[in-house]
């Protein structure tokens, strides 16, 4: 039972392109305050796409990405950054 409890407590479901909040939290964990609001909005989508693909447990396929997903990830990352400035 102990093993199952540890597994349940550490299980993280896979992340996909529409999991904007999960992706934003992972990006903030990776970059922290290195990227402020202005820098986040200036990130090239090609770089953002690459960084999302590098997130552990990310199971989205590159071809499933689109500009709408990347815009939502970018704006959600800004909100995550703002929340951590308090």
Feature map (PLM): residue ranges:
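N-terminal amphipathic/basic-hydrophobic helices that include classical n-h-c signal peptides
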Residues: 1-7
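A charge-rich, low-complexity, intrinsically flexible signal that marks solvent-exposed coils, linkers
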Residues: 7-86
């Amino acid at each position: 039972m102990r093993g199952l409890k540890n597994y349940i407590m550490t299980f993280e479901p896979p992340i996909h392109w529409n999991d904007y909040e999960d992706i934003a939290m992972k990006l903030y964990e990776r970059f922290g305050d290195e990227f402020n609001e202005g820098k986040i909005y200036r990130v090239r989508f090609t770089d953002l796409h690459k960084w999302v693909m590098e997130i552990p447990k990310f199971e989205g396929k590159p071809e499933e990405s689109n500009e709408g997903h990347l815009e939502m990830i970018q704006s959600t990352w800004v909100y995550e950054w703002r929340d951590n400035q308090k």
